[in-house]
């Protein structure tokens, strides 16, 4: 907003400059001492400005509405003048064209009747063509229904074959699972056999170890016995040498008896110990032999059972392989049969679609011809209705003209100038050529 105390503005308003120079205290209520407007004054000025703008917009809108109204009034006045001229022309030409109009409408009526008869003949021929095509359409529908039934039958056959195929696949998967189970059982039996072989090897190793241990202990015992024998021989020789030194017979007998008794006692103890050791060793060997025999018998029984199980599994696997090969051959035959049926179904469907499209094209052509005939018939009916309306309108005009003529003859003699004739001759065409808008304007 501009400053009211601007020097350029004060130069243009000398009275305001004198008031400001006379005293700053005598300012109006809307202006402050610094020369600017107060907030209240600014608000009032803005409201006044908005009101002025709104009034300007309303005045412009009213001006536009008034201009449109004036244009409409002028247009309606021009139309009224045109209609008055047309009414004058019709009044002047009524007494000259009354007979010609009747003849013209009679000829047009006859031509319309001929057109209606031709259209009826066309409609009858179209109906005959439709009746001729009805058996083809019925046969096409029957073929369609039969093809649908064949399609349903083929689908049912396909589903049954798919069911058989799924059963064969299920049996195949079951056989494969049994084969894997047999392979697992075979691997388990092989692992059990390997474990038993390792146990046998371990038992043989323990047996060899114990045998070597006992043989070493027996060798050591023999060495100890030989040492004891050598010591005893040495002691005996010493005693014999001592006895030889003793020359008395009594001592000799005593030593001989003691020596024989000691030797007998040693021999008895040795035989007793050897018998006990032999008995213990024989018992231990018999025990170990029985244990080994029992282990070998259990191992042989397990091995025989495993061998029988392997033979049984092999027979089952061979049987399953034969069934699997048979099912695979049947599966291949069914797949080939399904492919052949698919191809045959597609071919039949393609041929049927071609025939159906041809029939549909024929039906569409007949429908188009029927629609064209119906449109032409509607046009003819509309033309007939318009002609009847025009005849009624001209009849009313003629009646009005006759009424005006009688009234003029009874009251006032009216000398009307003859109507201007066209250069190319009298007008005999129908107002129907101008369309329905001209008829509405006449009405």
Swiss-Prot record:
One of its GO terms (cellular component) is nuclear lamina. One of its GO terms (biological process) is nuclear envelope organization. Residues 1-58 are annotated as: Head. The keyword Coiled coil applies. InterPro entries: IF_rod_dom. Residues 240-257 are annotated as: Linker 12. Residues 258-403 are annotated as: Coil 2. Belongs to the intermediate filament family. This is Intermediate filament protein ifd-2. It comes from Caenorhabditis elegans.
């Amino acid at each position: 907003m501009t400053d009211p105390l601007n020097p350029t503005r004060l130069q243009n308003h000398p009275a305001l400059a004198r008031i400001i120079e006379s005293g700053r205290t005598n300012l109006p209520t809307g202006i402050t001492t610094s020369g600017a407007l107060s907030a209240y004054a600014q608000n009032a000025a803005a409201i006044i400005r908005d009101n002025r703008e709104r009034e300007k917009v309303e005045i412009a809108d009213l001006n536009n509405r008034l201009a449109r109204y004036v244009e409409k009034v002028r247009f309606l006045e021009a139309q009224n003048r045109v209609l008055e001229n047309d009414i004058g022309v019709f009044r002047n030409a009524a007494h000259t064209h009354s007979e010609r109009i009747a003849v013209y409408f009679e000829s047009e009526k006859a031509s319309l009747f001929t057109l209606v008869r031709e259209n009826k003949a066309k409609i009858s021929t179209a109906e005959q063509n439709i009746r001729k095509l009805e058996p083809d359409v019925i046969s096409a529908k029957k073929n369609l229904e039969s093809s649908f039934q064949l399609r349903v039958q083929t689908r049912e056959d396909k589903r049954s074959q798919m069911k058989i195929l799924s059963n064969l696949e299920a049996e195949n998967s079951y056989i494969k699972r049994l084969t894997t189970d047999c392979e697992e059982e075979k691997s388990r039996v092989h692992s059990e056999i390997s474990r038993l072989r390792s146990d046998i090897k371990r038992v043989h190793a323990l047996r060899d170890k114990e045998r070597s241990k006992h043989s070493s202990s027996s060798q050591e015992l023999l060495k100890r016995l030989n040492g004891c024998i050598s010591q005893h021989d040495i002691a005996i020789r010493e005693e014999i040498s001592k006895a030889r030194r003793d020359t008395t017979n009594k001592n000799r007998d005593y030593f001989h008896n003691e020596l024989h008794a000691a030797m007998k006692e040693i021999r008895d103890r040795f035989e007793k110990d050897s018998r006990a050791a032999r008995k213990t060793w024989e018992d231990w060997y018999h025990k170990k032999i029985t244990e080994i025999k029992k282990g070998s018998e259990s191992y042989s029984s397990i091995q025989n059972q495993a061998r029988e199980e392997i033979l049984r599994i092999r027979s089952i696997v061979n049987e399953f392989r034969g069934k699997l090969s048979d099912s695979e051959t049947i599966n291949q035959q069914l797949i080939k049969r399904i492919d052949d049926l698919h191809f045959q179904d597609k071919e039949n469907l393609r041929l049927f679609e071609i025939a159906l499209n041809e029939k549909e094209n024929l039906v569409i052509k007949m429908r188009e011809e029927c629609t064209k005939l119906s449109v032409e018939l509607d046009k003819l009916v509309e033309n007939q209705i318009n002609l009847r309306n025009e005849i009624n309108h001209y009849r009313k005009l003629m009646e009005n003209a006759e009424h005006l003529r009688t009234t003029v003859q009874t009251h006032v003699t009216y000398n009307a100038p003859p109507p201007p004739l066209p250069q190319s001759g009298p007008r005999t065409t129908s107002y129907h050529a101008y369309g329905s808008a001209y008829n509405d304007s006449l009405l």
